[in-house]
Amino acid sequence: MNVQIFILLLIISWLTPKITSLPPESQVLDRSSFPDDFVFGTAISAFQSEGATSEGGKSPTIWDYFSHTFPERTNMQNADVAVDFYHRYKDDIKLIEELNVDAFRFSISWARLIPSGKVKDGVNKEGVQFYKALIDELIANGIQPSVTLYHWDHPQALEDEYGGFLNPQIIEDFRNFARVCFENFGDKVKMWTTINEPYVISVAGYDTGIKAVGRCSKWVNSRCQAGDSAIEPYIVSHHLLLSHAAAVQEFRNCNKTLQDGKIGIVISPWWLEPYDSTSSADKEAVERGLPLELEWHLNPVIYGDYPETMKKHVGNRLPAFTPEQSKMLINSSDFIGVNYYSIHFTAHLPHIDHTRPRFRTDHHFEKKLINRSNHETGPGDDRGKIHSHPEGLRRVLNYIKDKYNNPIVYVKENGIDHYDDGTKSRETILKDTFRISYHQDHLKQVHKAIIEDGCDVRGYYVWSLFDNFEWEHGYNSRFGMYYVDFKNNLQRYPKDSVNWFKKFLSRPVVRSEETEDEKVCNVSRKEEKINKALDVSEGFKTSVDSIVNLIKNGSRIEEEDDEEERDFCAFKNHNDQLGFFLKLQNSLGF
C-alpha cells in the first residue's frame, strides 16, 4: 500500500503543473460550455440585405426614400441591390448551415408584405410567398427562423400619408401588419421580435437626424429639412411602444401561432462609465444615463410606465400612457432582446441652453469615446467605429437581472465592424482576428453572467452574417463574417471568423455503434496509451511499465467492465489523464 501511495503522489505531482498551465477560460470555451438549450445564431435585416427594392411587388420604404433623396447622407450609396439576399437566399442558407448555428434572425419588410402599409389595400402574395419559402428553406436545413417585424423600414406611403411613427394611426396599421405575419408564418416560427432598437429609431431618426427619416431641429443638424429634437424622439418612442404592445396582443390572440412561441422587444443599450472616475458629478450622470439606455423602453413593457427619472427631466414633453395603454404594456415581452456593441464614457453637462431643449441634453450629460485619462473605451483605432469592451455586456445583463427580476434575455446582436474605404485588399479584410477576439471576449462575459451571476441568458446572435448596407455608412462599414465583394457580382468569401465559429459551435460526433475490434481493449494497449500519455514529461523517471504492472497486479484493483475499459483506453489529454488517476485513487481506497 505504501508503494501505491508513493506512486499516486508521484503521479499527482507530475500532473499539477499540467493542470495549472491549462489555457484561460476564453480559450477553452465552446458550445458545450453553455446550457444545452442555449441558442447560437446570426442575423441580418431586410433592408440591409434583400435588395430587389422594386421587385416582387415591394413598395419604397423610408430608407429607400432617404438614400435616394439625400444620397449625401448615406455615403452616396443605397440598398437597391444590397447583397441580393432576395435572389440568393438558398445559397446563403447553405453558408448559415456551415457555421453550425442554431438560428437565423431576419426581418420582414413591411413594404414587401403590405406595399401601402394598410391591410385594407391588400396583402402582396409575392411577398408572402418569398418569406414562406425562406422560412421553409431554413427549417429544411435545421435552422430555427427568428423573425423581426420592424427593423426600421416601414413603407414610405405611411410617412407621406400621416407622418409615420409621429402619428398614433400607425399603431393600428402595425397591429394589422403583425397579424398578417402571424397568420401566414406563425405556424413555423417560434421566436418573434416586435421592434428592433426603439432608442436608435427615435434618437438617430428624430433628434440627431443622421438616420431615416432624418428629422431634427435645424440648429442640431443643418441637413435636417424639418423636425423638433425636443419632442419628436419621445413621441416616436411612445408610438413604437404602443405598436409593440398591439402586436403582442395579436400574437397572444392568434390561434395560428405555435403554442410555445415567444415574442419580445429588442433594445440597444451601451453601457456607461464616468468620464472622470473621481468625479461625483460624472458618476451621477451615469445614474441618469443608464435609465435612458435601458429603462426607457423596458420599464413600459414590464411595469407599464416610464422611469421616474425621465418624467423628472423631460416633464410634460414626455407623453403619458392611459390606464388602458399601461395595462396593455405590462408584461408584454416574453423575453428581453439585447443588442450590445460597446460602452461610452459619460460626462456631466453643468450648463444647458434651456431655450433649445433636445433629447441629447435633457438629462444633463454627454457621451464620449475617450475618458479624462485619455483612455479609449476599448481597442478600435482606425479599424472601425466599434471599440471592444466586453465587460460592459456582462454589466448590462446584470443590470437587467437586478432591475427586472431576472427575465429571459437573448443577446440578439453582438458584433464589430471593419472600416473599408475601398483601398483595403480583400485578403486584408478576410484576416479578421480582431473579430475573433471580440466574440471570444464577449462570449466569455456572457458565460460568466450565466454561470457566476445567475443571469437567465438563453442565446447569442452574431451581427452579421455578411457585409451589407450599413445605413448612413453605406457599404464602408463591414460587420459580416462573410466578406461581400461589392465590385464583383457580390461574391461571398469566408473571413477567418467563419472558421473560428465553425469550430466553436461544432458538436461532437455521436456514433451509434462500435465495431467488435473497437470494443476489445487489452492490457498491452492500455500500457501503450498510458506510456504515451506519461512520457511527455522528461522529468518522469519512474518506469511506466512498472506502474502499469503494479496497477494491473494490485490486490485491490478489479478488472473494469467493457465500457470502463474503453474510457480507460481513450484518454488523450491531461483532463482525461486526471479523470483516470482520480478513478485509480478511488479504487485504492484513498
UniProtKB/Swiss-Prot annotation:
Pfam family name, one: Glyco_hydro_1
Catalytic activity annotation: Hydrolysis of terminal, non-reducing beta-D-glucosyl residues with release of beta-D-glucose
Binding site for a beta-D-glucoside: Q48, H151, N196, E197, Y341, E413, W463, E470, W471, F479
Annotated Gene3D superfamilies: Glycosidases
Keyword Glycoprotein (UniProt): yes
A GO biological process held by the record: carbohydrate metabolic process
EC number: 3.2.1.21
Disulfide bonds: C216-C224
Presence of the UniProt keyword ATP-binding in the record: no
UniProt keyword annotations, A-Z: Disulfide bond, Glycoprotein, Glycosidase, Hydrolase, Signal
Glycosylation sites: N255, N331, N371, N522, N553
Signal peptide as annotated in the record: 1-21
Molecular function in Gene Ontology: beta-glucosidase activity
PROSITE patterns (UniProt xref): GLYCOSYL_HYDROL_F1_2
PANTHER family: BETA-GLUCOSIDASE 29, GLYCOSYL HYDROLASE
Family to which the UniProt record says this protein belongs: Belongs to the glycosyl hydrolase 1 family.
Name of the protein: Beta-glucosidase 29
Native source organism of the sequence: Arabidopsis thaliana (Mouse-ear cress)
